[in-house]
Regions:
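A short pocket-lining beta-strand/turn micro-motif at the edge of beta-sheets
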Residues: 418-421, 504
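Short secondary-structure junctions and interdomain/linker hinges
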Residues: 340, 354, 455-463
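Formylglycine-dependent sulfatase
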Residues: 3-5, 18, 31-414, 418, ...
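Bacterial N-terminal signal peptides
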Residues: 18-28
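Hydrophobic, well-ordered secondary-structure elements that form the walls
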Residues: 316, 422-424, 428, 448, ...
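Short, compositionally stereotyped local motifs that mark structural "simplifiers"
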Residues: 3-4, 436, 443-450, 457-549
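N-terminal secretory signal peptides that target proteins for export/translocation
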Residues: 1-13
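Short beta-strand-to-coil "C-cap" segments at the C-terminal boundary of structured domains/repeats
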Residues: 292-294, 425, 547-549
Length: 549
């Protein structure tokens, strides 16, 4: 067939003209989808100290009305199996900020780096120290800053190690997203101390906002006026917490930021009471977690997946469309890099608490929970001096001394502890009936025993070593090793910086500024700039100042 050139051209022209709108629409949609995929959402963390889910209405306890948190739950997802890997704050916070188990980091003891007291535990010969982390382990907000996020922390920095520069744009009691550039995405953390353990005795003379006689007393406590009073103080503190959280949520709404922001509400470990905080029982490690996604996606729903604090860092990076570093032990539970596999196990640890030393490990699989006590001669009710200030703790001690506690309560005080504990959490949520000697559960016992052994090896559990031995290994000269100087190359009016240790982060700032930025490209040599290298556990490099005067 011979085609007339003009006819062929006309047909081609008609085809192109007819398909152009379709191509344009396809390109337009594709670009919008690509743009949507790379949008950096605002992410806000609202953190309650020392609270278990069992005290909150979205988990079934209606003792205290918490309207702001209840509304957040309606707009988001309530997670019923969220866990801290350690039942106390500083080690737990080290897991949150790094994406790794405290037992792998060396932050498993409470405390290691003590910003409140440099002497730390002088009677034990334990100074304040910042463990040396494996190369490549960094505080995850720095990755957000590299992508252009404005990061704020209000205001607790009790990470159990000395933080490095370059992580936060602001970290203070005044830190807030409002100081960012116009339309700059932000990650903001707000810590609320009103529900902390210490507030049980510090708020004891404040008006109660619930009636003690209307409360349900957990079966691990005696039903006495003293116990009911402290329970009522906690519920009252939760009401005060709800009011404080409501103010942050109202700010987001008034600025038009609420709908399309991702909001986490969680507790940093279990409740403030004895056998809650510092205990490897569910009361000590299970935490409340609500996540409101952009546009209220999956709103008013419940999720039973296992989530650990080691998953928080990779999950936030994934939500920000940043690939989590492979060195993180946690997995992304949400976002662009969400893991294809659900978590099957929850692991947790317990070691030194202030001046008291013990060692326990636990693993949960399905409905079963296994706990190993490495020091059975030590009571679970170790006399931590900080906790001894609580009226309830004083009351329990007196009842124990007078042999006035029932079996459910006295088990926490008794020695020796069983070397192994096994519980069916569906039938026994407070872990009162140890099933480790049940014949029909021996296969389950052996399975969890071996799985815990494997986890200890796989994650290089540093709790295997005495704390002083770790300190001597990290600091043979009695102080943190100093990093080698930065390398610099000057080309024209630009200076490029590097460091032989790939685990070192380089930070810089103009001399007049107070905030350090993460180095990512050559700097202008004509400006007055300071730069240094930082790595967790090490003394910073010598300060590089240029141009030289």
């Amino acid at each position: 067939m011979i085609l007339n050139f003009n006819t062929s051209f006309t047909l081609k022209k008609k085809f192109i003209l007819s398909i152009y709108p379709i191509l344009y629409l396809f390109i337009f949609i594709s670009c919008n989808q690509e743009e949507k995929a790379t949008i950096s959402p605002n992410i806000i963390w609202l953190v309650a100290e020392d609270q278990s889910p069992e005290f909150l209405p979205m988990y079934g306890d209606l003792s205290a009305k918490l309207p702001h948190l209840s509304n957040l739950a309606k707009d988001g997802v309530v997670y019923t199996n969220a866990y801290s890997p350690v039942p106390v704050c500083a080690p737990a916070r080290s897991a949150i900020i790094s994406g790794l188990y405290p037992t792998s980091l060396g932050t498993h003891n409470m405390r290691t780096y003590n910003a409140y007291n440099k002497k730390n535990q002088p009677a034990m010969g334990i100074p304040s120290y910042s463990p040396i982390f494996q190369s490549g382990i960094k505080m995850f907000p720095r990755y957000l800053r590299e992508k252009g996020y404005y990061t704020t922390n209000n205001s607790k920095e009790d990470y159990n190690f000395k933080k490095t520069e370059g992580v936060w744009d602001e970290s203070s009691k005044k830190a807030h997203w409002k100081n960012r550039k116009p339309n700059q995405p932000f990650f903001s953390v707000f810590n609320f101390g009103i529900t902390h353990e210490s507030q049980i005795w510090r708020q004891t003379n404040q008006p109660l906002l619930v009636k003690p006689e209307m409360l349900t007393v957990p079966p691990i406590f005696p039903d006495t006026p003293e116990v009911r009073k402290d329970l009522a103080v906690n519920y009252s503190n939760l009401i005060r917490l709800d009011s404080q959280i409501g103010k942050v949520i109202e700010q987001l709404k008034s600025e038009g930021l609420y709908e399309n922001s991702i909001i986490f509400f969680y507790g940093d470990h279990g409740g403030p009471f004895p056998r809650y905080k510092r205990a490897l029982y569910e009361t000590g490690i299970k935490v409340p977690l609500i996540v409101k996604f952009e546009g209220k996606k999956i709103a008013d729903s419940i999720n039973d997946d296992f989530i650990s604090f080691i998953d928080f860092a990779p999950s936030v990076l994934s939500l920000a469309n940043i690939k989590p570093p492979t060195i993180m032990q946690g997995k992304a539970q949400f976002g662009s890099y969400k893991s294809d596999k659900e978590s099957e196990f929850i692991f947790a640890s317990s070691d030194r608490f202030d001046e008291q030393v013990d060692r326990l490990r636990s693993v949960r699989f399905g409905k079963f929970k296994y706990i190993r006590n490495f020091n059975p001669k030590i009571s679970n009710a170790i006399p931590v001096s900080y906790r001894e200030q609580m009226p309830m703790m004083k009351h329990l001690n007196k009842l124990w001394e007078n042999n006035q506690l029932d079996d459910n309560v006295s088990a926490w005080f008794k020695t020796p502890k069983p070397i192994e504990e096994l519980y069916n959490l569906e039938n026994d949520p407070y872990e009162l009936k140890n099933l480790s000697n049940e014949n029909d559960l021996q296969d389950t016992l052996v399975f969890l025993r071996e799985r815990l052994d494997r986890w200890i090896i796989e994650t290089n559990d540093l709790g295997e070593f005495p704390e002083k031995e770790l300190i001597d290994k990290w600091f043979p000269k009695g102080k943190p090793p100093k990093l080698a100087p930065l390398n610099k190359i000057i080309s024209g009016n630009k200076i490029s910086l590097s460091h032989p240790d790939t685990g070192v982060s380089i930070v810089w700032k103009q001399v007049k500024d107070s905030i350090w930025s993460v180095y990512s490209k050559p700097l202008d040599y004509s400006e007055s700039i300071q730069a240094k290298g930082v790595r967790i556990g090490y003394e910073d490099t010598s300060l590089l100042i240029f141009p030289h005067k």
